[in-house]
Amino acid sequence: MNQFDKKSQAWSALFSEPMSDLVKRYTSSVFFDKRLWQADIAGSLAHADMLAAQSIIAPADHAAIQYGMAQITREIEAGEFEWKLDLEDVHLNIEARLTQLVGDPGKRLHTGRSRNDQVATDVRLWLRGEIDLIGGLLTDLQKALVEIADKNVEVILPGFTHLQVAQPVSFGHHMLAYVEMFSRDAERMLEVRRRVNRLPLGAAALAGTSYPLDRERVATTLGMVDEQGQPQVCQNSLDAVSDRDFAIEFTAAASLAMVHISRFSEELILWMSQNFGFINIADRFTTGSSIMPQKKNPDVPELARGKTGRVVGHLMGLITLMKGQPLAYNKDNQEDKEPLFDTVDTLKDTLRIFAEMVGGITVKPEAMERAALRGYATATDLADYLTKKGLPFRDAHETVAHAVKAATTHQVDLSELPLAVLQEFNPSIEKDVYEVLSLRGSLNARNILGGTAPAQVRAQIARHRARLG
């Protein structure tokens, strides 16, 4: 008979030979899922509390489990806990150490529980905490954008469509566009959190358990409750242990947040380039070149743009991971953690650095205004002026196109064309047209809810400040 330590794995009594070292390395997750240790201990303590309340384990066993978990917490926090590859994952490592510390009570902890519902609970608990942190970071970034918007309400930026100069906008208004995007990202995170915050524990391996578990007690202990304080428990044991849609949904929300950061990054990269020259980014967020001494490279926005592809890739990976799995749990689901962990880390790091970087942006109003003038940004204002004089808008549009052509020929802005020249295109044009053709006049004219007029921008800034606190 081939002798080996059948206690090295929790499931090894059935087997006649040990797992190969290659398979151990291939199937082990402990060196990345150990970050779940706090959630694992919290879930185990709540489970033990319920087992004792239901008289499934004795009070002495409950006390021993609490003592052992407190000791394990101290060891992990002190960096003294020995994580073992042989024990596969965070769950068995902690359980083995608990049994080593307190004996049989540690063996009783797993009563009525499977690793299938245990890991699903741990990931949900961990992700809930991370979503709360991300919500705070999204708030910080929005506040930073509101501050730079407030300082630059009167600064005129050429607004673009198709990357062509379109109409003048307030730089503050432009910044607030991203505040709106990130506020929706925060809303999505809260919606995801509501679905993450449901308890799988008690589903056991896939079919539930014959023990009289009080799942709602565990949910309440772990804070898995709704807005009214009612416990939120997964209602189908098969679904509870097998689906990772909550991880996919979070990664989708994270991908959207990163896409918004990537769009902002693209603009910062363009605006910092010599071709635009609209802004400077503080030196601490840029790098130089090893060969070209004149270079100041926007590495942080470029990396954020690149990391967006990585996070979106994780979303596609998780969707593909789930698409072919039959019910219930399959080992495939071990592959959910690394992309989920990396998505969380990437999003948090990016939000932190962008909130700080926004505060280090220097705006160059003169360069922005020159660019707006070069692009005939007030052409639409002239068309609106003619429409208000009674000309159908399509005719006004054509008339202004001829005026722009004339200005281009003479290499001047529309506001620099003499009145007599403008009247050649339409005799109803009067001297007051120059108020319309100025960048400032164009900006002030958009005094409508959601518009770019400084008065509207200041109102939106006040609204966001009240919302963000």
From Swiss-Prot:
GO terms for cellular component: cytosol. The gene is argH. It is found in: Cytoplasm. Its main location: cytoplasm. Belongs to the lyase 1 family. Argininosuccinate lyase subfamily. The keyword Ribonucleoprotein does not apply. InterPro entries: Arg_succ_lyase_C (IPR029419), Argininosuccinate_lyase (IPR009049), Fumarase/histidase_N (IPR024083), Fumarate_lyase_CS (IPR020557), Fumarate_lyase_fam (IPR000362), Fumarate_lyase_N (IPR022761), L-Aspartase-like (IPR008948). It comes from Polaromonas naphthalenivorans (strain CJ2). HAMAP family: Arg_succ_lyase (MF_00006). The keyword Nucleus does not apply. This is Argininosuccinate lyase.
